[in-house]
């Protein structure tokens, strides 16, 4: 069996059959030469949640200088920082201690994942809140295709989603799009799947769906934004309302979209036929709610609320409680 050669960067590639992949990953992605990465006690302690060992090690300057070092550890394959490891395991006390000792909260691993993102993915609310309070970017990193908001919306963790929103997460954000309309090497979107509002509906997570809308999520996302829906795959939903109906979501999803000002004319009547109903049977009550809403003009009260919220913009909705208005009107504007 031939030995592995060298890669384009001059580093040795994987060796013969059955190569030690962990060692190869360490060689490729660790922050320091291999001879300096043999001592993984700091990373191992973060993995098992051994706070006392972390305290002891970080009393020494040699370990304090390595607090942001990416390295493999006892049970890990991809080189990560101690904070990233502790966040993955959900050791909130270790996460807090490492941050207070100088760990950088927004460093990314080789996949572009931040400590906050992996805390959310693994469902650790305490670690999520500690990282957010320490200033972690609630939107994650542009180097990764997903976001904390998107994942929380997909799995129905409304408690984590509330925390992300409270710390200013963008409820429409997705890292597939850039400010440029046609950025070089960008991938054009051909579906709604990158939209947090859409994914919460696709998985029938009503509470997350409501939270996103209350926080200012665009009910017509991808229809009046930077995406050309004409390039969507034939038969795929062109707007969130269309997707809600096709996925067989209950009537409450439709009612919320109507209440938050969705453009009902974006759904084509011909798209509601049996051949366009998708994998699930369309909810007859939801379809009836949609048809009734489309046939009856919205009330002036409803239109005013939508107009005021749009004028404020999603980034200023949190200021509504400070407006010089009666409490009932504030609650009305916030859909409380």
UniProtKB/Swiss-Prot annotation:
Gene3D superfamilies with a match to the protein in the record: Ankyrin repeat-containing domain (1.25.40.20), SOCS box (1.10.750.20)
Listed name of the protein: Ankyrin repeat and SOCS box protein 1
Subunit structure: Interacts with CUL5 and RNF7.
Gene Ontology biological process terms in this record: intracellular signal transduction; male genitalia development; protein ubiquitination
Tissue: Highest expression in testis, spleen, bone marrow and salivary gland.
Record CDD domains: SOCS_ASB1
UniProt comment concerning the protein's domains: The SOCS box domain mediates the interaction with the Elongin BC complex, an adapter module in different E3 ubiquitin-protein ligase complexes.
GO CC annotation, single: ubiquitin ligase complex
Top-rank taxon, per record: Eukaryota
UniProt pathway: Protein modification; protein ubiquitination
Phenotype when the gene is knocked out: Decreased spermatogenesis with less complete filling of seminiferous tubules but fertility does not appear to be affected. Deletion mutant mice exhibit less severe colitis associated with less decreased body weight and longer colon length compared with control littermates after being orally fed with dextran sodium sulfate.
Function: Probable substrate-recognition component of a SCF-like ECS (Elongin-Cullin-SOCS-box protein) E3 ligase complex which mediates the ubiquitination and subsequent proteasomal degradation of target proteins. Mediates Notch-induced ubiquitination and degradation of TCF3/E2A and JAK2. May play a role in testis development.
Keyword Repeat among record annotations: yes
Domain SOCS box positions: 287-336
Entry GO MF terms: ubiquitin protein ligase activity
Family to which the UniProt record says this protein belongs: Belongs to the ankyrin SOCS box (ASB) family.
């Amino acid at each position: 069996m031939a030995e592995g050669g060298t890669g384009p960067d001059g580093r040795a590639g994987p060796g013969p059959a059955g190569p030690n992949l962990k060692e190869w990953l360490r060689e490729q992605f660790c922050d320091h030469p291999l001879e300096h990465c043999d001592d993984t006690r700091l990373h191992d302690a973060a993995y098992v949640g051994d706070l006392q060992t972390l305290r002891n090690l970080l009393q020494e300057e040699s370990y304090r200088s390595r607090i942001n070092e990416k390295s493999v550890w006892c049970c890990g394959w991809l080189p990560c920082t101690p904070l990233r490891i502790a966040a993955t395991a959900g050791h909130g006390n270790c996460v807090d201690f490492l941050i207070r000792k100088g760990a950088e909260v927004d460093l990314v691993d080789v996949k572009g994942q931040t400590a906050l993102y992996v805390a959310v993915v693994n469902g650790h609310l305490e670690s999520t809140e500690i990282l957010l309070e320490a200033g972690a970017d609630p939107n994650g990193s542009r180097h990764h295709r997903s976001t904390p908001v998107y994942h929380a919306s997909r799995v129905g963790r409304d408690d984590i989603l509330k925390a992300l929103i409270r710390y200013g997460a963008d409820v429409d954000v997705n890292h597939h799009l850039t400010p440029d309309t046609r950025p070089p090497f960008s991938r054009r979107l051909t579906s709604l799947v990158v939209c947090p509002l859409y994914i919460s509906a696709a998985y029938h997570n009503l509470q997350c769906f409501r939270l996103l809308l209350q926080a200012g999520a665009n009910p017509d996302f991808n229809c009046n934004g930077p995406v050309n829906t004409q390039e969507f795959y034939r038969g795929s939903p062109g707007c969130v309302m269309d997707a809600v109906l096709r996925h067989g979501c209950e009537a409450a999803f439709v009612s919320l979209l109507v209440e938050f000002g969705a453009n009902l004319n974006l759904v084509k009547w011909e798209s509601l036929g049996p051949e366009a109903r998708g994998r699930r049977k369309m909810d007859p009550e939801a379809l009836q709610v949609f048809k009734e809403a489309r046939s009856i003009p919205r009330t002036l009260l409803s239109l005013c609320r939508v107009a005021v919220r749009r004028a404020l913009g999603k980034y200023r909705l949190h200021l509504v409680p400070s407006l010089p208005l009666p409490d009932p009107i504030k609650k009305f504007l916030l859909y409380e």
